[in-house]
Each structure stands twice: as C-alpha cells, then as structure tokens.
Regions:
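Conserved catalytic or regulatory cores that recognize and/or transform ribose-phosphate-containing ligands
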Residues: 1-115
C-alpha cells in the first residue's frame, strides 16, 4: 500500500476519477484534487488558488509517489512545478499517458486482479 497524490490539469476530471478508482482498488490511499474548476466552470479567487496550490504541495509531502494525469501528454505549468517538487523530494512519479489505466479499466479487470 502506498499513499499516492494525483497531479494534473483540472480539466481532466474524468481521467482523475479513473486514476483514483484504479489506484484505490489496488489497495493504495489516493489523494486527489478538491475542485475541478476548469472542467466544471467553477471559479476560485487568486487567494484560493494560491491556498489550493500550497495544500497540494503538502499532499505531495505526505505521499510516497505522485501519479500525473497527463491526458494526451498534456502537462501545464502548475503540474510541471508539482513534478519538479516531487523530484526534489525524492518521490516516485508515474504518468497516466504511459497507458497503465484505460477508460474501461474497471470493466475489464477481474476482482482478484484489483488487489
């Protein structure tokens, strides 16, 4: 069991949900985002954005690794900073774009393969 923080653009809510389910069903503790403002049209203030960014770095601090939700290889500037931070802290880093998780992962895996 590992503690894994999901990192990536908030416009990829569905991919975050897939990654969260996949990694959780492997027996991991998954820490995700609080808001998906880009995919839900939710607006936050600059001060709130700064708070959420700082909290995300603390999430990385308590994690064993990060899982980057980089749909089609997209990595924005905030996610790039999170990756660099995780590297500096010696955290393992995995990427969604490596194909470990497909959109039908929960339908194709047998229960005994999940753990």
């Amino acid at each position: 069991m590992k503690i894994i923080t999901l990192c990536g653009s908030t416009k990829f809510k569905e991919a975050f949900e897939q990654a969260n389910a996949f990694l959780t069903l492997q027996g991991n503790i998954v820490i995700s985002l609080a808001f998906f403002e880009q995919s839900e049209g939710f607006e936050i203030t600059e001060k709130q954005a700064e708070l959420l960014g700082n909290l995300h770095f603390r999430k990385i601090d308590i994690s064993d690794e990060i899982f980057v939700v980089d749909v089609n290889g997209y990595i924005g500037s905030s996610t790039r900073r999170e990756i660099e931070y995780a590297k500096e802290k010696g955290k393992a880093i995995r990427y969604y774009s490596n194909g470990e998780i497909s959109s039908n992962v929960l339908r194709t895996m047998k229960p005994n393969e999940l753990i």
